[in-house]
Amino acid sequence: MAKLLGLTLVGLVLALYKNHRSSYQTRLNAFREVTPVDLPNCTLVKGIEAGAEDLEILPNGLTFFSTGLKYPGIKSFDPSKPGKILLMDLNEKEPAVSELAIMGNTLDMSSFNPHGISTFIDEDNTVYLLVVSHPDSSSTVEVFKFQEEERSLLHLKTITHELLPSINDIAAVGPESFYATNDHYFADPYLRSWEMYLGLSWSNVVYYSPDKVRVVADGFDFANGIGISLDGKYVYIAELLAHKIHVYEKHANWTLTPLKVLSFDTLVDNISVDPVTGDLWVGCHPNGMRIFFYDSENPPGSEVLRIQSILSEDPKVTVVYAENGTVLQGTTVAAVYKGKLLIGTVFHRALCCDL
């Protein structure tokens, strides 16, 4: 009898392992291959060799990049150097990046590890750059003021909070206020492993301001990119491992109400909102397994989606760019400016194409 119970228990454990392994492979799109979609006049951005995980384009074409992210379990082509914030002018004929000096002596640059970024422009046209950083595997939001004439960033403040143990991306709604996607990737390797493997949906979205901090949405399988509609009425949230983008209605008290969900056959990463049309541009991982288990002989591909009329009954989803990793590995973000598409990656290069 004891032997029978033991064999039954072993069988149940093996079945559970097999089911979770299958689910894990499905959530990571382990077996999907890329169907190439090309764009004209694509050129690699000069000066980016260790990733452009996130980017923000200002109305005048100046563009911020976060680069050099050290991400647990993810490839790094420059592991010994701290991260940087880069600047590029998309109005130049052959744009190239330069590193922004960080002023103020209040930030430890040796442990600077920039991740998601977001900008806020106030009534005086002062530009604030909010940067998620992971010094020593923790999470902070670093607040900077952009000094355009000096081409530098003035560090103003470091934000930490117990509800923000492992921030992924942010959407600024003020100089020190933002929505943040929050997972367990940096918080604890043990939690991270279980969350990734079992799909425990532990991720959430937090609203932060100096006066109030609260969880405004939860139950996500790896909450990732986040963006806000042009009219400020809706918040878009990418659920990476569920292959979904959620649309939430934003209220005057900063709470969120779920409105609709779109599903895809790719892992959706950062979300950029078209400043003219309001369309969503999404950097995606067609095969997420290759991101977490890097092989130079079989590198992760890249994919960019454009979502038009997302609030309608029948949104239009277009694969604008797709590539098998020969040119661009591990796309995380895409944004547009005057007929150009700028594409960034978690650890590789960045690409600029004509639309």
From Swiss-Prot:
Protein name: Serum paraoxonase/arylesterase 1
Superkingdom of origin: Eukaryota
Designated gene of the protein: Pon1
GO terms under cellular component: extracellular space; high-density lipoprotein particle; spherical high-density lipoprotein particle
Xref: Pfam families: Arylesterase (PF01731)
Catalytic residues (positions): 115 (proton acceptor)
EC number: 3.1.1.2, 3.1.1.81, 3.1.8.1
Cofactor requirements of the protein: Ca(2+)
